[in-house]
């Protein structure tokens, strides 16, 4: 597409191999076309509002970034076998969100993983539950929690704790109604999965791409934004395999 002069919107990940990604980005740079990578969660109104609080300095210096991402049901083992694994398929969104929220690069990861949801995923060579610790170049720390199955729905939350305050984005629910009675508190479960949860974000990211092309402006999610989470994911895989922290620059 780049050689043909076509502007590109590419879903994540661009590829699973950093060499292939770097070669593709070189072609994009050479051709002068526009490339946007599909990290739609950046365009979620809630997460974007948290990022704006960080970028404006309202929270001071970021100290701790916490991201919770849990799917409502695990994928088939056949899908897992060809997806590149949990870190490259699922957590890659969270690695991007960590960069987006912090405004800095991840320098080190320490990943813990287990098979607690579906034994078939383990037989396919992957994990279904993970906790990943992050270190950022700007001194902040991060925690990502992942599970392939949350029985109550699609659990998508972020929190940034800074020197001047904290900003949180909670789950979206069908309604904001809360019932209080003698049995306790009742409220809606989170929206079931990504199509419902991120409907506005999908529309907003495509509009941003169209606007960038029409107005000849830089796209809001660059090729490097597509490469960086892949490097973090590969470092997380190495960390899980070796049982120790891994520098992202080693990938």
Identify the residue ranges that each predicted region occupies.
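Hydrophobic/anchoring residues in structured secondary elements
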Residues: 64-67, 111
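Hydrophobic residues in well-ordered beta-strands that form the structural core
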Residues: 9-10, 35-37, 66, 144, ...
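Rossmann-like dinucleotide-binding domain that binds NAD(P)(H)
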Residues: 77-141, 147-152, 224
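NAD(P)-dinucleotide binding in Rossmann-like oxidoreductases
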Residues: 115, 120-126, 137-204, 222
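C-terminal helix-rich "cap/oligomerization" subdomain common to oxidoreductases
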Residues: 22, 30, 137, 208-251
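A general structural signal for well-ordered alpha-helical segments in protein cores
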Residues: 21, 47, 94-95, 177, ...
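Basic phosphate/pyrophosphate-binding loop/patch that engages nucleotide-derived ligands
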Residues: 26-34, 48-62, 161-162
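Beta-strand-loop-alpha-helix segment that lines the small-molecule cofactor/substrate pocket
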Residues: 1-42, 57
């Amino acid at each position: 597409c780049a050689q043909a002069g076509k502007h590109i919107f590419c879903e994540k990940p661009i590829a699973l191999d950093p060499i292939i990604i770097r070669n593709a980005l070189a072609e994009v740079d050479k051709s002068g076309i526009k490339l946007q990578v599909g990290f739609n969660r950046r365009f979620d109104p809630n997460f974007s509002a948290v990022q704006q609080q960080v970028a404006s300095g309202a929270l001071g210096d970021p100290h701790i970034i916490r991201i919770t991402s849990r799917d409502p049901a695990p994928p088939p083992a056949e899908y897992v076998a060809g997806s590149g694994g949990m870190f490259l398929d699922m957590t890659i969104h969270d690695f991007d969100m960590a960069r987006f929220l912090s405004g800095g690069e991840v320098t080190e990861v320490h990943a813990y993983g287990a098979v607690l949801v579906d034994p078939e995923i383990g037989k396919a060579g992957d994990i279904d539950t993970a906790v990943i610790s992050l270190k950022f170049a700007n001194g902040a720390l991060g925690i990502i929690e992942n599970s392939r199955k949350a029985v109550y729905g699609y659990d998508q939350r972020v929190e940034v704790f800074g020197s001047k305050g904290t900003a949180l984005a909670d789950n979206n629910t069908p309604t904001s109604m809360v019932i209080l009675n003698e049995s306790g508190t009742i409220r809606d479960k989170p929206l079931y999965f990504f199509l419902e949860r991120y409907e506005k974000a999908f529309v907003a990211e495509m509009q941003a791409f169209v606007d960038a092309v029409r107005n000849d402006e830089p796209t809001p999610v660059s090729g490097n934004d597509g490469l960086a989470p892949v490097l973090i994911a590969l470092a997380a895989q190495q960390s899980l395999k070796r049982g120790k922290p891994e520098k992202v620059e080693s990938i």
